[in-house]
Curated annotation (Swiss-Prot):
It comes from Methylobacterium sp. (strain 4-46). This is Methenyltetrahydromethanopterin cyclohydrolase. CDD domains: MCH. Pathway: One-carbon metabolism; formaldehyde degradation; formate from formaldehyde (H(4)MPT route): step 3/5. One of its GO terms (biological process) is one-carbon metabolic process. Catalyzes the hydrolysis of methenyl-H(4)MPT(+) to 5-formyl-H(4)MPT. GO terms for cellular component: cytoplasm. The gene is mch. NCBIfam families: one_C_mch.
């Protein structure tokens, strides 16, 4: 990807999607708070009930307006046939430059104990992560949006931190938040199936400039009131039921190497529901082999040769065990 190429503003593209979400708050079962001079807060699943459709739209906001998310009754897991499909014609910017939950936000010095990972186009306006140096990208926009996997609204300290980092006033920021246990939360997490493949491609050192297009799909996980079980189900949807196809401007050797490196089957921890793996490591998320966080099955198509290279495998029985 050339640094001289004119890059779209992910926040500008996402702004109409955010405004449509807010306008439809009642029918999507969302709660919106917008006080003068303060950040706009959209509760999509904490105190508000939220909805699957809200989660689908939030996923498109997370992609910075550079991707489409659809939900359809089809898929490889017979007992759970509803599938979330994600497509982007600019998957690196959409997934890594916007959707990736890479910004750690905490109530530093406060007493709330608030912590959440920020995702969505607001990340690109702040560019607080080293990843943006590698992407040669920073967004500049009058309005920004950030999505939080959280059961509570961000405290004033986090709002101030985000606004300052992005170079905007607090009232120019929209926070959309929902816990993984909610309908919207589960949906938008499963919609990260393409993103985890891009993140894995980055982590194994593949030249991201060669990634041209991408599409991914995973079964929609049912929500669970327990956080660990809910997190486990969304992870299992991708790890054991996720499928991704990347289209790369690379030769067959590179495409084959990428395909072989991407699937979750490369992980030493592959083979059990995520909640069980999490318990095995006593709740230490970072002790789990990072190679596990990948789609189950990957196809990498070389646009230079027309040959597609496949690796990994679906494990529908583990999806069914997790979702039951």
């Amino acid at each position: 990807m050339s640094s001289t190429t004119v890059r779209p503003s992910v926040n500008a593209l996402a702004t109409p999607l955010v405004e449509a979400l807010v306008a439809d708050a009642a029918k999507l079962r969302l709660s919106v708070s917008a006080k003068s001079g303060e950040a706009r807060l959209v509760d999509a699943g904490a105190q508000a009930r939220g909805s699957i459709e809200a989660g689908r739209r939030i996923a498109e906001i997370c992609l910075g307006g550079l991707g489409t998310v659809t939900i359809a009754p089809a898929g490889p897991v017979a007992a759970w046939p509803v599938t979330v499909t994600v497509h982007s014609a600019d998957p690196v910017l959409a997934c890594l430059g916007s959707q990736y939950a890479g910004w750690s936000l905490a109530d530093e010095g406060g007493s709330s104990g608030f912590f959440a990972l920020g995702s969505g186009p607001g990340r690109a306006a702040a560019a607080a992560e080293h990843l943006f140096e590698e992407l040669h990208y920073r967004d500049h926009a009058a309005q920004i949006a950030l999505v939080l996997e959280s059961a509570s609204a961000p405290p004033a300290s986090v709002v101030a931190k985000v606004a300052e980092a992005a170079g905007v006033t607090p009232d120019a920021v929209t926070f959309i938040y929902a816990p993984t246990q909610s309908l919207a939360g589960a949906t938008q997490v499963v919609a990260r199936v393409l993103e985890v493949a891009l993140h894995k491609a980055h982590s194994v050192g593949f030249d991201l400039a060669k990634v041209v297009d991408g599409i991914g799909a995973a079964p929609l996980s049912p929500p669970h009131p327990d956080f660990i079980q809910a997190m486990g189900r969304t992870n299992d949807a991708i790890i054991y039921g996720g499928r991704v196809q990347l289209f790369v401007e690379a030769d067959d050797a590179e495409a084959r190497g990428l395909a072989e490196a991407l699937p979750s089957t490369t992980s030493r921890d592959h083979g059990a529901p995520f909640a069980e793996i999490f318990a095995r490591f006593n709740g230490d998320f970072y002790a789990i082999d990072k190679h596990l966080f990948s789609p189950a099955e990957v196809v990498v198509t070389s646009l230079l040769s027309g040959t597609s290279h496949r690796a990994g495998r679906l494990v529908p029985e583990l999806v069914e065990r997790s979702f039951a």
